[in-house]
């Protein structure tokens, strides 16, 4: 399971012109599910999303987590992060989970996040989404579980 996280001042996801998820200050997490992933992988990713220290403390050091600042978490499914780009000029998606498994584990991650954090929003799995964000820093990390 992969999570590309970006520290944001705000972010929103639209589907067909309708805002389906939005946060203010917090993290945007683009999430890819791979074939071998399990609910345990999702739990580990969620733990990192909530506790990874990417927000500045009083001294300007990245020493505070999403939980520490009470920020929002916007989860967006993005199977393209699981692409194999090592060969050729076209990505291969054979390394991404089948849609049914991807949907199941993304929904599991979303439900667990909503149960553990007060400000969680999401995109719509499998939809053509437009993601708008204001990067803060920019601060971007790839988390791999």
Curated annotation (Swiss-Prot):
GO terms for molecular function: D-tyrosyl-tRNA(Tyr) deacylase activity; Gly-tRNA(Ala) deacylase activity; Ser(Gly)-tRNA(Ala) hydrolase activity; tRNA binding. It is found in: Cytoplasm. It comes from the Bacteria. A Gly-cisPro motif from one monomer fits into the active site of the other monomer to allow specific chiral rejection of L-amino acids. It comes from Pseudomonas entomophila (strain L48). HAMAP family: Deacylase_Dtd. Belongs to the DTD family. A motif (Gly-cisPro motif, important for rejection of L-amino acids) lies at residues 137-138. Keywords: Cytoplasm, Hydrolase, RNA-binding, tRNA-binding. GO terms for cellular component: cytoplasm. The keyword Ribosomal protein does not apply. Gene3D superfamilies: D-tyrosyl-tRNA(Tyr) deacylase (3.50.80.10). It catalyses: glycyl-tRNA(Ala) + H2O = tRNA(Ala) + glycine + H(+); a D-aminoacyl-tRNA + H2O = a tRNA + a D-alpha-amino acid + H(+). Its EC number is 3.1.1.96. This is D-aminoacyl-tRNA deacylase. GO terms for biological process: D-amino acid catabolic process. An aminoacyl-tRNA editing enzyme that deacylates mischarged D-aminoacyl-tRNAs. Also deacylates mischarged glycyl-tRNA(Ala), protecting cells against glycine mischarging by AlaRS. Acts via tRNA-based rather than protein-based catalysis; rejects L-amino acids rather than detecting D-amino acids in the active site. By recycling D-aminoacyl-tRNA to D-amino acids and free tRNA molecules, this enzyme counteracts the toxicity associated with the formation of D-aminoacyl-tRNA entities in vivo and helps enforce protein L-homochirality. InterPro entries: Daa-tRNA_deacyls_DTD, DTD-like_sf. Its main location: cytoplasm. Homodimer.
């Amino acid at each position: 399971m992969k999570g590309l996280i970006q520290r944001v001042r705000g972010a929103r996801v639209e589907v067909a012109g309708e805002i389906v998820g939005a946060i203010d200050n917090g993290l945007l997490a683009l999430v890819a599910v791979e074939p071998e992933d399990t609910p345990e992988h999702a739990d580990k990713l969620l733990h990192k999303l909530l506790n990874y220290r990417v927000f500045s403390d009083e001294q300007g050091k990245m020493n505070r987590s999403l939980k520490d600042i009470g920020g929002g978490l916007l989860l967006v499914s993005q199977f393209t992060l699981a692409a194999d780009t090592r060969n050729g000029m076209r990505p291969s998606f054979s390394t991404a989970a089948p849609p049914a498994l991807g949907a199941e584990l993304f929904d599991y991650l979303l439900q667990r996040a909503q149960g553990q954090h007060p400000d969680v929003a999401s995109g719509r799995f499998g939809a053509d989404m437009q993601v708008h964000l204001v990067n803060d820093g920019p601060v971007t990390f790839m988390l791999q579980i």
